[in-house]
A protein has these predicted regions:
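Catalytic-core helical/loop segments in enzymes performing group transfer/polymerization on anionic/lipid-linked
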Residues: 1-512
Length: 512
């Protein structure tokens, strides 16, 4: 995809979202929220590109007429009509809370940890201030793990897993909303004069019947139920700009008290990040955040320079994942080891691991540690990638120990879109971005003008690593460290007090 095509598609999606008569069903369509240039985000727009040769008459994999996938989806929907929703017993037992945190369950092992994977010790910090809170987890697990999560009872009473089913009448209403959104968008495609607007509206009409759209509307219904029971003053969730976040904030404002809606910019901010940089301003559908918490000085400045955010307030918060400073050996005193850091996308994991294995075959004197994202299921990962079952002698799969420990042992790292590379640079590691021909770059360190290098082939890696070892640029490494030190800050407790002050919540001073 070209820069021009990306910008045109993003603008067309925004026009559809802001058009008069936009419904909640339209806002729920994931396709209409252009997040960023990551390949996993761009894949859904492939039919809009010339090489796809998509025409009006071509059947889409998302339409009711393309029976195989949709028939299966319809069957699951019918089954869901007769399945009772999972219980909200914990919410009923809690009663009213001051702060509702919406986070994500990406691994069963994270359910019993004292701190949340995305928000760290936020609940503890609130409790120290005498502020009540509840942590609601969106269940992103699959198969047996997804079912087991609802039967586990060992986690704290102030945590709960959001139901993924709704009452039969609500399920039926959801699919009516999807069908209505499809009809409106097909009409918009028919009426459009611009070819991009026409193509985007047509594709969006197909996606109106996708599982993702229905899941977002189901999420809206479940969050409405939770907010009705807990009546929070503040609701906080992660924020990258996708449709599910809009569902959460709109649902929270639809019941009882109007809470302060907060988004936490927890992930890396790509050069072309779109949806997080603007408010939607959908007529009659209040789904923008009131506040965005930022994870560091650099992303804070980038969002502050985004005129599309309008009156949304930015508050510097930081990240619990920011590692404490450690005394580390100099780069030339470490073993010749390369840390491989994919993000949580399976396709990206495959690309980066295959590239690393190719490098390992060309440089047997260098050790490679393949470190999957914490959300990745290792059993499933091995089953999908045969190459991981029998690794070369100089390659290991890093599944134990912390990222800090791995960083302390490495000289170099391979990465693409992972924010873990920031932690690697803070540990003094030389970062190498793996690019591919024909794609928009999505380098997490795009704004870093020194120290990082771009690779197109394993041969590039061998050449660049040899040059780095022969003449390490310590000054560039120090400047890169300073950059990353500003990208992710330590948690700023005063940010919590600012939020509580905005809603007039009574607070006691936390113990020192």
């Amino acid at each position: 995809m070209t820069e021009q095509a990306y910008a045109a598609i993003a603008a067309a999606c925004d026009r559809l979202l802001r058009a008069p008569g936009t419904t909640l069903g339209r806002v729920a369509i994931p396709l209409l929220h252009v997040i960023n240039e990551h390949p996993s985000c761009l894949a859904q727009y492939a039919p809009l590109l010339p090489s796809s040769s998509v025409t009006r008459s071509r059947p889409s994999p998302f339409t009711l007429l393309n029976s195989a996938r949709v028939a299966a989806r319809a069957g699951r929907a019918v089954t869901r009509l007769f399945r009772p929703p999972e219980s909200l017993t914990r919410a009923r037992a809690l009663g009213q809370v001051d702060v509702l945190i919406i986070s994500h369950l990406v691994s069963l092992s994270l359910l019993d940890t004292p701190d949340d994977f995305y928000f760290g010790a936020l609940q503890s910090s609130l409790r120290e201030r005498g502020v009540t809170s509840a942590l609601v987890l969106l269940n992103h697990l699959h198969g047996e793990d997804a079912r087991r999560a609802y039967t586990m009872r060992s986690f704290p009473a102030t945590r709960m897993i959001l139901p993924r089913t709704v009452l039969p009448r609500v399920e039926a209403q959801i699919w009516r909303q999807c069908a209505a959104a499809r009809g409106y968008l097909r009409q918009a495609a028919h009426d459009a004069h611009d070819t991009v607007d026409q193509a985007v509206a047509k594709l969006a009409s197909d996606h109106a019947l996708s599982a993702g759209t229905a899941e977002n509307l189901r999420l809206h219904a479940c969050i409405s139920d939770v907010c009705h029971l807990l009546n929070p003053r503040i609701i906080i969730t992660t924020h990258e700009g996708d449709a599910s976040e809009r569902m959460i904030w709109h649902a929270a404002r639809s019941t009882g008290r109007r809470p302060l809606c907060v988004g936490y910019q927890h992930a890396r901010l790509f050069a072309r990040a779109h949806a997080i940089r603007r408010s939607l301003g959908v007529p009659g559908i209040d789904c923008d955040p009131d506040v965005i918490l930022t994870q560091g000085e650099i992303p804070h400045a980038a969002l502050a320079a985004s005129p599309g955010l309008g009156s949304i307030r930015l508050i510097a918060y930081g990240s619990h994942r920011r590692a404490e400073p450690m005394t580390l050996p100099a780069l030339d005193e470490r073993p010749r080891s390369c840390l491989v850091l994919p993000d949580g996308d399976d396709g990206e994991c495959s690309i980066l691991f295959e590239f690393a294995l190719a490098c390992a075959r060309r440089a047997p004197e260098i050790a490679f540690a393949l470190r999957p994202h914490p959300s990745v299921n290792l059993t499933a990962l091995r089953s999908r990638h045969n190459a991981l079952r029998q690794l070369p002698d100089n390659v290991t799969l890093s599944v134990s120990g912390t990222l800090d420990q791995e960083c302390a042992r490495a000289r170099y790292c391979l990465y693409r879109g992972s924010s873990a590379v920031i932690q690697a640079v803070l540990a003094g590691i030389k970062p190498f971005y793996v690019a591919r021909a024909g794609e928009l770059p999505f380098d997490s360190l795009f704004a870093l003008p020194y120290w990082r290098e771009t690779l197109m082939s394993p041969e590039d890696f061998v050449t660049r690593v040899s040059a780095t070892d022969a003449s390490p640029d310590q000054d560039a490494a120090r400047r890169a460290w300073a950059f990353c030190d500003r990208y992710v800050s330590r948690v700023r407790p005063a940010a919590i007090d600012e939020l509580l002050d905005m809603v007039g919540a009574p607070v006691r001073e936390p113990a020192q």
